[in-house]
Curated annotation (Swiss-Prot):
This is Ribosome maturation factor RimM. InterPro entries: PRC_barrel-like_sf, PRC_RimM, RimM, RimM_N, RimM_N_sf, Transl_B-barrel_sf. Binds ribosomal protein uS19. It comes from Ehrlichia canis (strain Jake). The gene is rimM. It comes from the Bacteria.
Length: 173
């Protein structure tokens, strides 16, 4: 997959009999999902229009040339991407795209490397950062809050972590 692509959502299922699909969006607002133009899965491009917004991150959409439930079922679990340069420029230092965080070094407040960011999840209530620990093959997941991650430096490729006492500092062992 190209490095300049940002995942905006994933098709989770078909919806109805006329080829509509249910899409889990990763945009700040679900209405923004189609604002940036045609989307791609890395091979094909799709012209998508929103039929309805179901929840904070679920939409029902129509994809051009998908006309039946069978057609829509073939797209299940397909990730949809946009070229990063089609997204708006971020002007606030506290704003960034999730994709920019993947691979950042996670640094403890004592300047020791704790690990690096493997993935960002959202199971409903908030974003969760998955960190590959530097001293093992294990990983840990922590809520992505300003209290736990007080400082992010995208240009220098690191993020500071303030570990909750219940987690402890496993990199000291």
């Amino acid at each position: 997959m190209r490095n300049d692509l940002i995942c905006l959502g994933v098709i989770t299922s078909s919806h109805g009999i006329s080829g509509h699909v249910k899409i889990r969006t990763f945009t700040e607002s679900p209405e923004d999902f189609t604002s940036y133009g045609m989307l791609t899965d890395g091979t094909n491009t799709y012209k998508i229009s929103i039929v309805s917004v179901i929840s904070q991150n679920i939409i029902i959409a129509k994809i051009k040339n998908i006309v039946s439930r069978n057609d829509a079922d073939l797209l299940r679990n397909k990730k949809l991407f946009i070229e990063k340069d089609k997204l708006p420029n971020l002007t606030n230092n506290d704003e960034f795209y999730h994709n920019d965080l993947i691979g950042l070094n996670v640094i403890l407040e004592n300047n020791k490397v704790y690990g690096n960011i493997k993935k960002i999840h959202n199971f409903g209530s908030c974003d969760i950062i998955e960190i590959c620990l530097s001293n093992s093959k294990k990983s840990t997941m922590l809520p992505f809050t300003k209290n736990i991650f007080p400082y992010i430096n995208i240009k220098e490729k690191y993020i500071i972590i303030n570990l909750p006492e219940t987690i402890g500092n496993s990199s000291d062992t």
